[in-house]
Structures are given as C-alpha cells and as structure tokens.
Amino acid sequence: ITVPHFQQPVDLEAPRAGVLHTTEGGWDGSISVFERHFAPHFVVGLDRGKVAIAQLVPIGLIGGACRAHNNKAIVQVEMIGFSKETLWRPDEATAKALAALMVVCHDEWGIPLTHPWPEADWGHAGHNPHRRSGKFGHVAGWFGHQDMPDPDVHWDPGHLDWDYIFTLAQTE
C-alpha cells in the first residue's frame, strides 16, 4: 500500500531515528484511517490472527504523523495495539516482526538499534521527562511517541520492553 500524500523528502542530514506508536484500533480500521491521512511508514501487528507488516510511505519521504518533526530523518511505525488505558506490550509474534523491521531500518536506513534512555515506566501523557531533553531530532535511535517533544498528549507505545525488542533484533 502506498499512500499518495506527504510525498516530500526528509532532511537527510538529520540523525536517523524511528518513532513507535500504537494505533488505538484494529488493523482494518487503522489502515482505513491511514490511507486517508496521517499515514506512518509502516503498520505492524495482527491482521485476522496473523502478524502483518504494511508499508504505507516509502522510507526517505515524510510520514503523516508527528507533523511538527516530519522534516527529520525519521521512520514512523504504528503497532496494532491499545496503550492509552492499559499496560500494553506487543504479543510475541508482533514483537518479532517489529524487531525484524527494525533490523531492515538499521541495515537500509541507518537507524541504530538503541533507545536513548534507560527503561522506565513514565506513565501517561506528559509525564515523561525526556520530552523536553532536546535529544529528539539530534540523536539517532528509536523513540516512543511519548518521548517526542510537544504536544504533551501522547502515551504510546506504552510499556514497551525496549531491551527485549533489541535482543530479538540482534538475533535476526
């Protein structure tokens, strides 16, 4: 699937980074919304009981979410999941698919398999002290949407076990 909007190049001089989100909806509804607007580069998760990966925007072009930061060299990945109200982590198959996608993003786009901060539970929107650290856009690696500066209303991707995902990626 390729979404026809946001076909603008990113700043290739910016540090390579990935941003993980949760859809807060299922596969079909999320894809339907993303085909109209706010498309990420990839969607990963369960589609009719099997894990799937869909690419909606080519890497190197601006994705539809995180508009204030889209000129950066970021790859946006939406995981099918609900992290706003519950302690969510991807199931094993989704975690493995995410790790495999991260390896491709590392090999093809240069995003290091790192997260810029130690593991912690920062709770819901606005409580993550890293939001104002100034690292996003200046440090390469993988970020959660909750790690990005402004607006202060994001919680995703929830309580992701970054170390576990990177361990899976290193075994790919």
Residue positions per predicted region:
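A cross-family glycoside hydrolase active-site/sugar-binding cleft signature
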Residues: 21, 78, 143-145
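Short coil-to-beta-strand
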Residues: 68-79, 140
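Short C-terminal domain-edge/linker segments immediately following a structured domain
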Residues: 48-56, 75, 106-112
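Basic/polar, cationic surfaces and motifs that engage anionic cell-wall
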Residues: 1, 7-8, 84-172
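Short, low-complexity, polar/charged sequence segments that are solvent-exposed and flexible
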Residues: 37-43, 73-76, 95-97, 161-165
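N-terminal catalytic cores of peptidoglycan-degrading enzymes
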Residues: 1-71
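Short, histidine-centered active-site or binding-site loop motifs used for metal coordination
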Residues: 24, 79-83
